Every structure is written in structure tokens, then in C-alpha cells.
Amino acid sequence: PPSSTLFPSTTLFRSHIHFSPVLQKTPHATEAMFLMMIRVFDGLGYRRYEWKCDALNSRSIKAAERLGFKFEGIFRQDKIYKGRNRDTAWFSIIDKDWPNLKNAFQSWLNPENFDTDGQQILSLTEIRNNQ
């Protein structure tokens, strides 16, 4: 009967991730996030991947947007953090976004998208917007 059936969660929340300064803002960091997304959508079959952060954390917000997470809103006074009310910004990628986003990551990670100094030719955002 439905009342005794347990349904697995179809959402995965990206908890805290901390890259060392050596890895920050490198193609390897972007590839690591891409590999996590492959696992979430292709490997585990989730429908939704969430990114939540302090609404004052501009670096986290910028990273979420660059990686293709879409802003969904602010949970006002979601938590108390370091003695202050913390508003939480919510972002997500859903399964219908995944095929185009996956193609954008694959195009961005292609060695032909990097010059001889290892600098990107097109940004991930530019590739996503040109699809």
C-alpha cells in the first residue's frame, strides 16, 4: 500500500565544498563540479541538484550562476549564523536543464577551448548562452 511505500529523495543538496587556493578558479575545479553533476543526474538519476548559500556570499553566488545553477529565491532569516540572521539564496539545476548544461561543460572542457597558456577561449557562460 502507498502508505507503507518509501520513495527515495529525488533531490540532492550540494553541501559545503571548499577548494584549496591552488584549485580555485581552475579548469580542474570546474571539471570536479561537472563530474559531481554527472553522478547526480546520469549515475543516480536525481531530478534536482540544489545549491544553497548565504545570500551575502557573493563568491558562492557567482560560482553557482557560472556553473549553470538557476536562482530560485531567498529564504529570509533561514538560519542564525555568527549571531546574525542569515538569508539563504537557493539555486538549482533540474533534469530538464541537464542535457544542454552537460553539452556546455563538455564544450568548455575541450582542450581546443584553451590557448597555449591554458586560458579559456570561451567562458562556460558564453558557451551556455550560445547553445
Regions found by a protein language model. Give the residues of each.
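Conserved GNAT acetyl-CoA-binding A-motif
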Residues: 42-52
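Acidic/histidine-enriched, glycine/proline-rich intrinsically disordered or flexible terminal extensions
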Residues: 99-131
